Amino acid sequence: MALAGIGVDMLEIARMQQAIERRPHFIRRMFTDAERAYCERTARPAEHYAARFAAREAVLKALGTGFSSGIGFQDVSVERDQLGRPQARLAGKAAQIAAEQGVQEIALSISYTRDVAVANAVAVTNAVKPKVDQKEDAAQELARSFKEARSVLDEL
């Protein structure tokens, strides 16, 4: 397997709480029915909404795009597998872009503290492994990304 892209995003939970309170239609527009049902069953829904929003952003960064290129807000959603692990679900334009890039899997990790939600996504393909010099560049990029994420966590 080869790495197609990596994305990291974080969001202050208080900002999500404010968005929910000020614009209730925001969650209906942004999140799928399944995501809303899950988040609303929890003790602190804003944490889970923030984590899912950060996950969307991380997935889109891993694909090399944002909510541009005709990608709809619900084209990326987060579900849980039978073990409770987060799984990225792609639809519409996001699924099309992933298919064009040969993405076979998106590994997703979500975490949050009292104040911040953070998500990390790695898009993986079945492509032939890159040449040695390209592999070093990808490894350096991955190391730099993890260092940046670690420095953010250290500041918390």
Model-derived regions: residue spans:
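Core catalytic alpha/beta fold that binds nucleotide/phospho-ligands
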Residues: 1-6, 10-156
